[in-house]
UniProtKB/Swiss-Prot annotation:
PANTHER family: MULTIFUNCTIONAL CCA PROTEIN. GO terms for biological process: RNA repair; tRNA 3'-terminal CCA addition. One of its GO terms (molecular function) is ATP binding. Residues 225-326 form the HD domain. This is Multifunctional CCA protein. Catalyzes the addition and repair of the essential 3'-terminal CCA sequence in tRNAs without using a nucleic acid template. Adds these three nucleotides in the order of C, C, and A to the tRNA nucleotide-73, using CTP and ATP as substrates and producing inorganic pyrophosphate. tRNA 3'-terminal CCA addition is required both for tRNA processing and repair. Also involved in tRNA surveillance by mediating tandem CCA addition to generate a CCACCA at the 3' terminus of unstable tRNAs. While stable tRNAs receive only 3'-terminal CCA, unstable tRNAs are marked with CCACCA and rapidly degraded. It comes from Neisseria gonorrhoeae (strain ATCC 700825 / FA 1090). A single active site specifically recognizes both ATP and CTP and is responsible for their addition. InterPro entries: CCA_bact, HD/PDEase_dom, HD_domain, NT_sf, PolA_pol_head_dom, PolyA_RNA-bd, tRNA_CCA-adding_enzyme. Its EC number is 2.7.7.72, 3.1.3.-, 3.1.4.-. CTP binds at G8, R11, R91, R137, R140. Pfam families: HD, PolyA_pol, PolyA_pol_RNAbd.
């Protein structure tokens, strides 16, 4: 019985990165051997055990065989005769198919170290095509490390998409990998790789439809709506924004794909036109509520947020109410963060100031100076409870108006 450190721990060690989780493979053992040594079985799908002291995962070396479409259609074989190389061969990418023995020696039968040095993501074997999740994983690793995907691997990924493997992906797995990819250092790279292999058209057709749609060059020197979306997403990542904010950045301009061709490159109403596509994506991916709500909010209101200097005080108040800013000020702030990414996610505009954010927050703070509790109590005391909302609005407008006048005159 021999144990080896495998997978991501070896990869990150060789890259000089912190090793977060350590996974082990056991060669020359079976379930009875593991149980006799005090290991605890985990689940029943795979022969995986928890170490009695470290609680790290130890898996019996195994081979896998495709039995049906999708990521779940596998059967496995694990016994004492399965070799380390056979176990490593079933893994997705060469950089993940390395092991380290107890003496620190690296076992690398498929050239993972070579590909790490070259910055290449390459599939280990044709079995890569048996699991459609690997399309998403390869794109995610490209986003994490900035690596390129080998041409033969991209070709295989395209074939998988053409064969309908991507159609078999369930929403939970797509969201799981997408969310991880959005939180990587270069999330733009993930979307680019998914588009290059054709998977974006299957998984996020609303985003894929943005590519090739022109915008006004005076607002968008990058011209292409899809390129702007990638730049906005990447700017959100560079700003260190959260997952809901990055997700909203990805979906904020879906309405531009709905613009009638005869009015291009203008996109009047794309904020409103984008709401339904955003909802469709949210439902299809089963996006978490916080992500879904922020994406819809940003899509619907980002143009109005940009144009705050042109708005009347009454419109300002209406926007604050419709966006639920009084009850959910933190979400309102995150929406404005995405608007910064939208403004700066344009060619040669990455340092463009965005005073609108500070002004919106100042307007909200000013409106909150109106004592709604006191106003409500006074109205009730006077038998005019039906005037409460109107009186609160008047008080808020009285606070907003002078501040907005100053900003518009600046």
């Amino acid at each position: 019985m021999q144990t080896y450190l495998v997978g991501g721990a070896v990869r990150d060690y060789l890259l000089g990165l912190p090793v977060k989780d350590r996974d082990w493979v056991v060669v020359g053992a079976d379930a009875q051997t593991m149980l006799a040594q005090g290991f605890q079985p985990v689940g029943k799908d795979f022969p995986v055990f928890l170490h009695p002291k470290t609680h790290e995962e130890y898996a019996l070396a195994r081979t896998e065989r495709k039995t049906a479409k999708g990521y779940a259609g596998f059967s496995f074989h694990a016994d004492k005769d399965v070799t380390l190389e056979q176990d490593l061969m079933r893994r997705d990418l060469t950089i993940n198919a390395m092991a380290q023995d107890a003496d620190g020696k690296i076992i690398d039968p498929f050239g993972g170290q070579r590909d790490l040095a070259a910055g290449i993501l390459r599939h280990v074997s044709p079995a890569f095509a048996e699991d459609p999740v690997r399309i998403l994983r390869a794109a995610r690793f490209a986003a994490r490390y900035g690596f390129e995907i080998a041409e033969e691997t991209i070709k295989l990924m395209r074939q998988m998409v053409e064969n309908g493997e991507a159609d078999a992906l369930v929403a939970e797995r797509v969201w799981q990998e997408l969310a991880k990819g959005l939180m990587e250092k270069n999330p733009r790279k993930m979307i680019e790789m998914l588009r290059e292999c054709g998977a974006l058209q299957v998984l996020l057709p609303e985003v894929d439809a943005l590519f090739g749609v022109p915008q006004r060059a005076d607002y968008h020197p990058e011209i292409d709506s899809g390129i702007h979306t990638l730049m906005t997403l990447q700017r959100a990542a560079d700003m260190g924004l959260s997952l809901p904010e990055r997700y909203a950045a990805l979906l904020h301009d879906l309405g531009k794909a709905k613009t009638p061709p005869d009015i291009l490159p203008r996109h009047h109403g794309h904020d409103i036109n984008g709401v339904e596509p955003v909802r469709e994506v949210n439902q299809r991916l089963r996006a978490p509520r916080q992500c879904a709500e922020l994406a819809e909010l940003v899509c619907r209101w980002h143009i109005i947020f940009h144009q705050v200097g042109q708005l009347k005080s009454q419109t300002i108040l209406n926007v604050l109410k419709k966006t639920d800013a009084f009850r959910r000020p933190e979400r309102f702030q995150t929406a404005l963060n995405v608007c910064i990414a939208d403004t700066q996610g344009r060619l040669n505009r990455e340092h463009t100031p965005y005073p609108q954010r500070a002004h919106w927050l100042a307007l909200l703070e000013a409106a909150n100076q109106a004592d709604s509790g006191k106003i409500a109590a006074e109205c009730r005391a006077q038998g005019k409870a039906h005037f409460i909302a109107e009186q609160i609005d008047r008080a808020r407008l009285a606070q907003i108006a002078p501040l907005q006048k100053t900003f518009r005159g600046a």
